[in-house]
């Protein structure tokens, strides 16, 4: 109570000159406490969001660190190996000069023929081998330890590389991905072939992964050839490597220990991926399946390889331990690292982190879209304005804005009242916006490097398309014939040709009375087809040439009649995604109108969807304040970002992918737009 | 979904909402607005209820922090002034309005530029509104909409002074347009009451005779 009175005192001091209010009303105090509590809550959510961002950053940096440490260790071990080599040479020299004292198995002549005889001995008896080692002195044992570590190391570094390339691939999703696995393989090989032990690695790989046996044999052959060229003076080492390999093979042929090294994680992993495949086969119609398979083939090998190499490193250690009669020792920590990396799903995922918050709108932002090529963004807001942002903008000293923040380069004025939707032409030269005023404004897009305080050019607004009698909620641009489609709450969908004397070409009424169109998009695989979503849980494909319905999507049994807020076409497949007020994202097959998949995706209504240009990732925004990144193929959530605060019951209103850059964006009822970059930047 | 959630009014202008249904939900008591942007919600709700009722619109909820209240009102003025700017784009062209003037007494320089510039009226209008939006969103001066720094309050006065010139230019040079806008929004009346109530501008600068006492004043000076 004392605190409260003090606080209200101080408040009153401030307000004393204004009015004389009752000093300590109960409701006043309660309200003050409530207010403070709200503030604290807000701060807390902000801190949590920051914390999550920082954690993602930390995880990434830790990964980087591991990679660096690993590289360092690798180099140190190589040095040690060379030292060991030298010691071996000296020991051999000694043995040669003291002939007879040494066991015949270790008597190695400089010529290549010695290797087979050595092998036959080694494969004959494990104990003998260890005894040999004992006789040869601690250095040999130490050498094997190093060898073991090194083998693990190869596996481990390969794993790291996989994680990285997977991450890069994931986040880019824009690069031709088919290249990556092969180039990665080459890298892996290069690293292996640097080592004299490489053939033993691959021999091991062969045996452990009999599923991939044939492929691995090819690798093996390839590497043997490479090694044969490289061997030269290190012949005896190559011989030893081969002997190890034989030893390991023999060990693995032993039924008792066979496959023990295969961890359950790999099995379950393979099982799940098989299940995924199976699901795809059962759920997806043929046309889509091939496309998904193609995507999956780009995706899966990398994952599998990463998994395999991790396991490979793991198994290698174990098996060598047993084969060489060694106990696990100081290598334990490395294995734990493997495990962590394997078990932690975040380690292999792309994380999007906020790059910039765009503050300039004064009321809820309703729509956003990136320029097709440039790092340029357009936002439309309930404050009646559309703003053009250049994300690469250099701070211009000409303006008296008093800040160092990113400011819009241009502000478009054309609508009376809230602007609700926007779309860019494929070149990014023209902008079309729809507003609550029922008009569509056609703008020429000014230079993204212009002066925000340039003089007004009325030619920027080229045309205003009038005809709708109520708010326009969605516009879509037909890429090939310069036509525009708009959806209005006057219940019609209209087709326009801007620049034509009579721009309105067709008016398409609602399929049922009482339902209103909410969202439109063109079908990527059939350019004369238009997707339209409606209130009351309805969506259809319309032929824009005739205005007739081609297909009505079958929602099945749905409780209530939730509005379908956003409809988007998959960029390459006859697949349609719809986000609904009922928190659900639904996948539809355009060929028969049936639901392929539906899932509750958010805590509150899904307001917006965006698909990356390759059709691999889906971004969704919701009035629960979060945006979520989804893997389209697995339909799993990869990341959630709490993005925007609520105004009334609205939060995130729009999400977007940059068509050609690794950028995503979100916009919200809190008047803010945010741009995110993937974690590696 | 549970029955409780379904029964709750969802205050959201979702896609498909008709213009007539925009923000058309049962008013919420200020105490029940639990979002961070509750002041903006509250202001817009009272405007929606009756834009002519300036006194109610400008009456803060009990114990409302005055800084935030003034700040959010100024934001709202700038939002609605975009409507006036849109109308001015139609007929306020550099050929007729080469300078930003109201009465012939002053030529206003545009402060959006590093060196104040003698922009034509339409550019002054656009630049001033864009500059105001930037300033009101500035991380330096207004990093939070929940808590306004004392030092930033003074910025509100300069924003108010500049945007007021848009009213005065429209009133003295585009009277028909001004009346059309004012009849619908009562924005100049609300703005004049606001800056007077919170002493953001000096009375002699409020040259548009929109309030009853201002009109009397003008009549007495004319006589
Ligand atoms: Zn003018
Ligand atoms: Zn200017």
Swiss-Prot record, chain B:
Is rRNA-binding found in the keyword set?
no
Q: Which UniProt keywords apply?
A: Cytoplasm, Golgi apparatus, Membrane, Metal-binding, Transport, Zinc
Residue ranges of the region described as Disordered = 1-23
- Quote the subcellular location field of this record: Cytoplasm, Perinuclear region; Membrane; Golgi apparatus, Golgi stack membrane
Membrane topology value = Peripheral membrane protein
Binding residues annotated for Zn(2+), in chain numbering: 92, 97, 169, 174
Q: Does the keyword Zinc apply?
A: yes
What is a GO molecular function of this protein?
A: metal ion binding
Q: Which Gene3D superfamilies match?
A: MOB kinase activator
Q: Which GO terms describe its cellular component?
A: cytoplasm; Golgi cisterna membrane; perinuclear region of cytoplasm
Chief location bin = cytoplasm
This chain's function reads:
May play a role in membrane trafficking, specifically in membrane budding reactions.
Annotated family? Belongs to the MOB1/phocein family.
* Protein name stated in the entry: MOB-like protein phocein
Annotated source species: Caenorhabditis elegans
Q: Which gene encodes it?
A: mob-4
């Amino acid at each position: 109570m004392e605190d409260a009175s003090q606080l209200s005192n101080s408040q009153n001091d401030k307000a004393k000159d204004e009015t004389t209010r009752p000093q300590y009303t109960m409701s006043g105090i309660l309200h003050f406490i409530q207010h403070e509590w709200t503030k604290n809550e807000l701060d807390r959510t902000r801190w949590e969001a920051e914390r999550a961002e920082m954690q993602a950053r930390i995880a990434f940096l830790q990964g980087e660190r591991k990679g660096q440490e690993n590289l360092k260790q690798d180099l140190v071990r190589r040095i040690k190996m060379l030292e060991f080599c030298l010691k071996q040479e000296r020991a051999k020299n000694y043995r040669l000069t003291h002939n007879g004292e040494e066991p015949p198995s270790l008597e190695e002549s400089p010529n290549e023929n010695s290797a087979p005889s050595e092998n036959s001995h080694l494969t004959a008896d494990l104990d003998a081998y260890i005894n040999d080692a004992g006789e040869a002195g601690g250095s040999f044992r130490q050498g094997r330890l190093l060898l073991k570590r090194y083998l693990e190391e190869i596996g481990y570094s390969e794993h790291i590389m996989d994680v990285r390339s997977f991450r890069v691939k994931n986040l880019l999703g824009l690069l031709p991905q088919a290249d990556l696995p092969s180039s990665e393989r080459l890298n892996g090989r290069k690293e292996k072939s640097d080592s004299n032990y490489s053939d033993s690695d691959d021999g091991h790989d062969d045996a452990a992964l009999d599923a991939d046996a044939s492929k691995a044999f090819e690798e093996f052959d390839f590497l043997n050839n490479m090694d044969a060229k490289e061997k030269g003076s290190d012949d005896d080492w190559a011989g030893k490597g081969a002997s190890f390999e034989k030893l390991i093979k023999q060990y693995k042929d032993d039924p008792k220990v066979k496959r023990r090294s295969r961890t359950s994680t790999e099995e379950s992993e393979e099982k799940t991926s098989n299940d995924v495949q199976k699901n795809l086969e059962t759920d997806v119609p043929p046309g889509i399946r091939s496309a998904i398979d193609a995507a999956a083939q780009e995706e899966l090998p990398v994952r599998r390889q990463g998994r395999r190499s991790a396991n490979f490193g793991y198994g290698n250690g174990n098996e060598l331990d047993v084969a060489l009669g060694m106990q696990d020792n100081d290598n334990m920590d490395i294995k734990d690292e493997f495990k962590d990396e394997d078990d932690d799903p975040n380690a292999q995922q792309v994380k999007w982190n906020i790059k910039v918050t765009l503050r300039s709108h004064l009321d809820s932002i309703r729509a956003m879209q990136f320029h097709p090529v440039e790092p340029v963004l357009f936002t439309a807001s309930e404050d009646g304005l559309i703003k053009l942002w250049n994300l690469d903008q250099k701070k211009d000293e000409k303006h008296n804005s008093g800040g160092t923040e990113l400011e819009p380069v241009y502000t478009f004025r054309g609508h009376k009242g809230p602007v609700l939707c926007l779309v860019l032409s494929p070149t990014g030269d023209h902008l079309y916006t729809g507003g609550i005023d029922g008009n569509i404004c056609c703008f020429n897009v000014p230079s993204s490097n212009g002066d925000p305080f340039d003089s007004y050019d009325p030619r920027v607004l080229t045309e205003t398309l009038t005809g709708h009698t109520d708010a326009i909620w969605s516009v879509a641009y037909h890429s090939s014939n310069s036509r525009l489609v708009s959806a209005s709450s006057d219940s019609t969908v209209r087709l326009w040709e801007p620049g034509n004397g009579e721009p309105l070409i067709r008016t398409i009424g609602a399929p049922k009375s009482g339902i209103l169109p909410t969202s439109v998009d063109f079908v990527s695989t059939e350019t004369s087809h238009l997707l339209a979503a409606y209130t009351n849980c309805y969506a259809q494909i319309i032929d824009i040439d005739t205005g007739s319905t081609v297909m009505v999507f079958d929602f099945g049994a749905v409780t209530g009649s939730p509005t379908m807020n956003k409809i988007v076409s998959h960029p390459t497949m006859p697949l349609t995604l719809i986000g609904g007020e009922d928190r659900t994202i639904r996948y539809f097959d355009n060929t028969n109108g049936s639901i392929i998949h539906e899932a509750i995706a958010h805590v509150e209504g899904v307001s917006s969807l965006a698909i990356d240009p390759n059709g691999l990732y889906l971004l969704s925004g919701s009035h629960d304040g979060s945006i979520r990144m989804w893997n389209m193929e697995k339909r799993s959530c990869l990341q959630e970002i709490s993005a925007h605060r609520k105004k009334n019951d609205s939060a995130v209103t729009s999400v977007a992918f940059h068509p050609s850059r690794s950028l995503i964006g979100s916009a919200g009822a809190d008047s803010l737009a945010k741009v995110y970059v993937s974690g590696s930047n | 979904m549970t029955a409780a959630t379904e029964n709750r009014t969802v205050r959201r202008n979702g896609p498909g909402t008709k213009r007539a249904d925009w923000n058309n939900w049962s008013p919420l008591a200020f105490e029940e607005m639990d979002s961070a942007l509750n002041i903006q919600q509250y202001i817009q709700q009272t405007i929606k209820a009756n834009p002519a009722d300036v006194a109610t619109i400008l009456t803060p909820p009990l114990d409302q922090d005055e800084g935030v209240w003034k700040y959010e009102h100024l934001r709202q003025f700038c939002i609605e002034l975009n409507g006036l700017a849109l109308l001015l784009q139609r007929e306020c062209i550099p050929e007729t309005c080469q300078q930003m003037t109201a009465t012939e007494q002053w030529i206003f320089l545009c402060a959006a530029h590093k060196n104040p510039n003698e922009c034509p009226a339409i550019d002054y209008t656009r630049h001033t509104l864009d500059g105001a939006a930037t300033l009101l969103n500035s991380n330096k001066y207004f990093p939070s909409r929940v808590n306004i720094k004392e030092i930033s309050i003074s910025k509100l006065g300069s924003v108010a002074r500049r945007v007021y010139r848009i009213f005065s230019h429209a009133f003295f040079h585009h009277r028909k347009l001004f009346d059309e806008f004012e009849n619908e929004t009562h924005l100049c009346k609300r703005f004049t009451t606001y800056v007077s109530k919170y002493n953001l501008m000096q009375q002699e600068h409020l040259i548009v005779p929109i309030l009853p006492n201002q009109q009397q004043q003008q009549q007495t000076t004319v006589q």
